[in-house]
Amino acid sequence: MSSNIHANHLSLDASSSSSSSSSSSSSSSSSSSVHEPKMDALIIPVTMEVPCDSRGQRMWWAFLASSMVTFFGGLFIILLWRTLKYLWTVCCHCGGKTKEAQKINNGSSQADGTLKPVDEKEEAVAAEVGWMTSVKDWAGVMISAQTLTGRVLVVLVFALSIGALVIYFIDSSNPIESCQNFYKDFTLQIDMAFNVFFLLYFGLRFIAANDKLWFWLEVNSVVDFFTVPPVFVSVYLNRSWLGLRFLRALRLIQFSEILQFLNILKTSNSIKLVNLLSIFISTWLTAAGFIHLVENSGDPWENFQNNQALTYWECVYLLMVTMSTVGYGDVYAKTTLGRLFMVFFILGGLAMFASYVPEIIELIGNRKKYGGSYSAVSGRKHIVVCGHITLESVSNFLKDFLHKDRDDVNVEIVFLHNISPNLELEALFKRHFTQVEFYQGSVLNPHDLARVKIESADACLILANKYCADPDAEDASNIMRVISIKNYHPKIRIITQMLQYHNKAHLLNIPSWNWKEGDDAICLAELKLGFIAQSCLAQGLSTMLANLFSMRSFIKIEEDTWQKYYLEGVSNEMYTEYLSSAFVGLSFPTVCELCFVKLKLLMIAIEYKSANRESRILINPGNHLKIQEGTLGFFIASDAKEVKRAFFYCKACHDDITDPKRIKKCGCKRLEDEQPSTLSPKKKQRNGGMRNSPNSSPKLMRHDPLLIPGNDQIDNMDSNVKKYDSTGMFHWCAPKEIEKVILTRSEAAMTVLSGHVVVCIFGDVSSALIGLRNLVMPLRASNFHYHELKHIVFVGSIEYLKREWETLHNFPKVSILPGTPLSRADLRAVNINLCDMCVILSANQNNIDDTSLQDKECILASLNIKSMQFDDSIGVLQANSQGFTPPGMDRSSPDNSPVHGMLRQPSITTGVNIPIITELVNDTNVQFLDQDDDDDPDTELYLTQPFACGTAFAVSVLDSLMSATYFNDNILTLIRTLVTGGATPELEALIAEENALRGGYSTPQTLANRDRCRVAQLALLDGPFADLGDGGCYGDLFCKALKTYNMLCFGIYRLRDAHLSTPSQCTKRYVITNPPYEFELVPTDLIFCLMQFDHNAGQSRASLSHSSHSSQSSSKKSSSVHSIPSTANRQNRPKSRESRDKQKYVQEERL
């Protein structure tokens, strides 16, 4: 009862005091000229539940004093301890010197007795130091973010600091100072618990600190000094003072560290952004808290009479408009302390605002536009494309991958590159936004691989920079990408481009690299030189093959020009489809003829499964092979929909249909439950091929009964002579020193060269290696008989060729003429006018920045050769002086009849008629090769006359192989076998091991590998097909060749001006791929066809010694090098009539 009366008395005293103060304020205001209301002094709320000071006296000084005493008292103790420690150290140092002097004076006899107590003392000190160090290390581990306990503790302290700041925000709505009962105030209890934890954590930090003085002065310690002690004072006095609790906002500076501990912030930009934001916000909130304190309290020297009631958030607003120098004036500081603080804060705040805010905006604006993660769409596959991502490479890839001729490409393309796309590339992505997405990142970063969902991707495609200055470095980068991707997800299918053939060996070192599961390396140098080598064997074949594996839209031309027929063939591509059950049991030629005549499809190969279920690709296997159930066929057609006819064909329903467009899925087909019909088009392509056979290799082989050579061939095998490499795929000879194959200009002139291949190469000792082995290997395939091998003469820098020779010294019939392709004397010495092909290559193309000048050497060499003039009597006189006539001149001899089916000109008097193929880097430079064409500089390469005629080749045409390989992994196997002469993964592993071919003895197994299909050019001028050459139908020729000789025709090499009514002297030819049945033939046409291997073709040369694999070689039936000493006494055996008849009219070339 008394306490209640006492409380009421305090309330009355407070009321009277308030009223008197109010009256005095009002009188003062009335006497003032400016009538401005004055804020009342702060009144401490007093209730009977909370005993407070009876006089209503303010106790803010007690709270502040507790903090100041703690801070300065601790600082004094630390300084005192340091001073005493310093004095002790100085004294001990002086005493130590005295004792040391005494020890020296007393001698060593007393050393043992005097040192013993000192050692005991040192041991005691060491034990004490060890105990203190252990406690210090324990405290350091407890607060260190390197351990789990430390991280939990650091995060917990930060979270509790934010909680204490939130409590401050809540209490800021109350008066600055008020009476509160600790046992009833819930927020005060929580704040007390938080500060007890802060006190314990402060103790751990103090123990772990190396420098106690600096620890005492750091920001976090100051925050604890001015926030922890006042809480304990609040409990003792039953009072609450808002005071300096706003300093807890300074803990926000550590926000970025906490996020790094939690592994949330990983990039430098994100860390910097969070740092700037945390510093800016913590400074802003702390300054607002100080303004809130002084404005609501007033100035002490004014007896707190000039205070104003401002909420904390109004102070936050005031500080923001102050930092931004806007200053609306609606809220402003009235106290002297507040205004003084604003004077200094506006200087620092303005500087911080002017520097931090733009940087924050820049970091936010520079946030990766292409960050994020890929979201997989249900029922839709996606592939990841990385590597060399530029406008050119991406546009070429998308143009082929998303071509309309492909059958419903339901695949999303995800590009991953560490550089954001430029405006042009970004526009390209937007045009294909429904199927293309771009993400910025690196495949070397597992986090970025996870962003693009590499583990669920159908494949990963790696593009290479074909124009880089250092091909080996580019290959190394792509190999590292493969390693990173395979390390992240070993099962992912990878298709990568490689520039150099020797770098493919490094891929075999990757444990998870498995070509049997779909991994493929597209070596651009290997395929480029392989295509050029095929042009040496059958000019124009490289253009036809390049067009077959590229997606081209049909361009219709009404006028009767060579472009009309060329473009009709260009629209054909290679597709695969399972054959209908109606073909089961039929021979391959029968099915091939039926498809061509009735379905308007050209089938060139099948996937054959032997008795042990091993799969092999067989090209034109012959009439002995019967079609099996579920056989996969390889077709040449204009689009994928046409190829489905082979799958839908039903003899009962479609036998009498003449229009192939009406061949669709019939009722019989719907009732069948065939395994192939359950496969999607992509599955059909992916499941076919050698990927299912662990022991099979992608070799083009015929049916098992024909794998063993005839008895005559076995009898003629010389087991003591190594004629072929260990796989039996290539001709081989013992390694030769480069000095033995070097010809001087006079030696070359004395050696009558004809029907050979001249390789003009530009390169020096510093040039990147081209990889000439890839050019020579197709020309030395074992499915050529030895006397059919074309001699190869390299004309170029001997320094460069020495670097390449290590990979060439095992091939026969190779010579080198040191010189330059720009020297006409060197070219005449090698009889370039009598060569079958002149190849112009350059190893210096990528070292020039100006793309227009990258091909300058090749273009100059090509124009130099074309401008040369020859006397047709020179070659005849040179040959006749030794008793020989150059092949192709004497047509009365059977051996010198049409060269491989191609009639050599009676004489070549101008370089324009010399067969040339020039390698180009820049496609637009093709306009400089032919001076008589009218090609526009912006014309695509495949539309230009030099490419259509097979006289130019660029590596860019191989870009389409990336998408072709993805949709059908057998395509790359097929094309590599065609253009490389039969290279296999086993051979690549051997070359990777030894970097050279290894010789092997002739056995039935290795000789069986010679039984591979070959390409021939069939002349229509005379012979068994001469009656069809003059106005006959191509379809009749197709059927006759297939039935009579098992030869599969697939294209025409026609004179450019053959359609003109007036005769033309132009000898240029162009390629027509897969003409229709009714296409009219002309006598000068050359027909591309696939023919069987003829074991008897080499019998007439069986007596030739295969050990003479040098430049001094045997003569060929049609083209060879005629070396004077070695050919004088050669006798030719008579050949069988059938063999001679075939070789008279067929130009046999190997793929």
From Swiss-Prot:
Query: Membrane spanning segments where?
Result: 60-80, 152-172, 188-208, 213-233, 238-258, 274-294, 341-361
InterPro entries recorded: Ion_trans_dom (IPR005821), K_chnl_BK_asu (IPR003929), K_chnl_Slo-like (IPR047871), NAD(P)-bd_dom_sf (IPR036291), RCK_N (IPR003148), Slowpoke-like_C (IPR048735)
Give positions of region: Segment S7. Answer: 529-549
Residue sites binding Ca(2+) per the record: 927, 930, 933, 935
Q: Where is this region: Segment S8?
A: 586-606
Output compositional bias ranges, type Basic and acidic residues: 1135-1151
Which terms under GO biological process does the entry name?
Answer: potassium ion transmembrane transport; regulation of membrane potential; vasodilation
Region Segment S10, residue ranges: 947-967
Q: Which family does the UniProt entry place this protein in?
A: Belongs to the potassium channel family. Calcium-activated (TC 1.A.1.3) subfamily. KCa1.1/KCNMA1 sub-subfamily.
Region ranges (Segment S9): 752-772
Extracellular topological domain residue ranges: 1-59, 173-187, 234-237, 295-308, 332-340
Protein name per its UniProtKB record: Calcium-activated potassium channel subunit alpha-1
> Where do we find the motif Selectivity for potassium here?
325-328
- Domain RCK N-terminal stretches: 380-522, 754-898
Q: Which catalysed reactions does the entry list for this protein? A: K(+)(in) = K(+)(out)
